[in-house]
């Protein structure tokens, strides 16, 4: 085990999920840990109890840290980069590490890292399943909320033996404080406006791009065709500089310049191309699977499968396990999750849809008529893009709730869409959507917004949606055996 933190004094700032894991792991590694949180102790009583159970004495309520005694400060991703406690540490020449930087420094197993605005969790879980199917002991960690299958990255790094693999979902906030972080394989799935309340567009792009910062020339940097072919790619390069690593690409069409490292799809199938040593099978037609064999709905999930497949291939996984998972994986909770069928109406929970790009892809994934429940706190970008998605994607009716409901409604009416209702609670929204839906329709929770105005988090929002649907008599928890949601 890495000894960098042994007998060192380390302040851990932010006592939520990742900060508590840092306290636990760094204490186990022999560090003298000082837990710190700016909130009063009474507001974080459970966290205080957890660190005290480790034998640690927390500093809370904005009390001062003694920077002179610190060897390191490890910050949680929820702490803003401009927070005084971090900037004071920088001014005092205390090394500030993000949780993923600390995790990388103690990790014995290789890390395969994924970032992007949307699709990170689904891709991470897909990749994890591909590695497991290949017989590799796999840990999934980072900025991921997917039931019981994931953990903070520092805990995964601590637990994983050298022969294992760690799949890491990485946010832009986590990438703000890296210096030596160098994953074995890194992927950037997509970039669209998000977190405008905390980062400018330029800051957001620069943070995402840092996932490739320390890769060497022969190490895989996996990028979507969406990024490579758009105007923004040139802007990204202007902001952050070109990628030094070996670019692998994935997307809609085959690209000759990536003829030995490209994954693509067409209307019939998914294809995966690699160097001959990677791809000894079917060299003339590198078919991964037919599209009809894929269980996940939506073109965005086709791209998630391709990204995970490329990462697995780059890591040395044979095609068999990759194909097995590509054709059997049924999804992740709160991501286009089938809930029930009531009176011929399907209910789909996509509570993780928290921005405009995810909203558009959610609607595109379900071409049937649908009643959409949306709203919350819009995180940035042009709200008119939500209206455009509604107008062109067979939305029978829109039920809005939350802080940004007036703005979304105004944008939709300006675009000529009028079938809109307002709800004060999610339960009321489900009731209204049910009344508006017809047999064969889908009621889709796709908020396009953050949840904190009405819910604890997006998981709480999704759970409440499922609970509301579950109260209807005759709700079937099993999806139908035929059609788009068969075997899901």
PLM region spans:
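N-terminal leader/targeting and accessory segments in enzymes
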Residues: 1-98, 102, 297, 483-487
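Extended acidic/charged loop-beta regions that coordinate divalent cations
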Residues: 57, 63-66, 159-196, 233-291, ...
